[in-house]
Design a protein with these regions (language model features):
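A short, conserved structural fragment
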Residues: 259-272
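Short amphipathic alpha-helical interaction segments
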Residues: 245-259
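C-terminal engagement modules used by replication, chromatin/transcription, nuclear envelope/ESCRT
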Residues: 275-276
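Catalytic cores of DNA base-excision repair glycosylases
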Residues: 3-221, 229-249
């Protein structure tokens, strides 16, 4: 797997950057594909090359710069984390996973990924691509469970290399992303096809649990429409915002949750803007 990775890996900029660059990429990649993250990551690193630079920005600048990456709360959490790092950690991303998890927006997975890819630590990175590759190769199943169980973590930790575990993590992640894909995997290109238990078992199918709600009518789509309009305007009245969406009650709900998440600010005379 590692030899395959050395020959076939993508030239992703956060593989040759500072710990801060790795951290920014991990926030962006949490729920957004690589091809959409690439241009935004370059923009952010050019504009805010260290935590201190981002810490000095306003929330409105941060949300606007986040663009259409989705889930803009990630931008505010990254902004808050940058302020803590600049103030409490001398502008240096902490190396310890427990300390990393104290920062806004960093859970167990993101802390493990930063530890591995920024500091070359032996940490258990349980990315969806890694999980899918290993559940097929080792367990002979098509797809992993929605969330890793304690048993799965223990089994994966048992096979984690003692040396260069960060390279193993990057290699298995890349193999899962490029070859052992969720749909239509390119098994003929896989370097471990001879050891794959899913193949040996005759490729048994596993039904994926999928959300049924159409994105176009979701509350998240409504929220995104409002935030995008406020990126493009200094402020908007509630009546103007309601014209952006066919369901007024959904707009009212979206405004309420956006205020709770501190993604927008209420102004006098029922106007709204991005937080300053």
């Amino acid at each position: 797997v590692v030899n395959w990775f050395k020959k076939n890996k993508r030239d992703l900029p956060w593989r040759n950057t500072s710990p801060w660059g790795v951290m920014v990429s991990e926030y962006m990649l949490q729920q957004t594909p690589v091809n959409r993250v690439l241009p935004k990551w370059h923009e952010w690193m050019e504009r805010w090359p260290t935590p201190k630079h981002l810490a000095s920005a306003t929330p409105a600048q941060v949300i606007t710069a986040w663009g259409r990456l989705g889930y803009p709360r990630r931008a505010l959490r990254l902004h808050a984390a940058a302020q803590i790092i600049a103030e409490d950690f001398n502008n240096q991303v902490p190396e310890d996973q427990e300390t990393l998890q104290l920062l806004p927006g960093i859970g167990e997975y993101t802390a493990a990924a930063i530890a591995a890819f920024a500091f070359e630590q032996r940490s258990l990175v349980m990315d969806v691509n890694i999980r899918r590759l290993l559940v097929r190769a080792i367990d002979g199943q098509e797809h992993p469970k929605p969330a890793p169980t304690a048993q799965e973590k223990a089994r994966r930790l048992a096979i984690l290399p003692t040396k260069n575990a960060h390279v193993w993590a990057a290699a298995t992640m890349e193999l899962g992303a490029l070859v052992c894909t969720s749909k239509n995997p390119s098994c003929e290109l896989c370097p471990i096809i001879g050891q794959c238990n899913w193949r040996k078992n005759g490729y048994p199918r596993t039904e994926l649990v999928r959300k049924s709600q159409d994105w176009q009518g979701t509350d998240r789509k409504c929220r995104g429409t409002i935030v995008q309009a406020l990126r493009e305007n200094e402020s908007l009245t509630e009546s103007a915002i309601k014209k952006l969406w066919p369901d007024e009650s959904q707009v009212e709900k979206a405004l309420k949750t956006l205020l709770e998440d501190q993604l927008i600010q209420a102004l006098p005379r029922r106007r709204y803007r991005l937080p300053q």
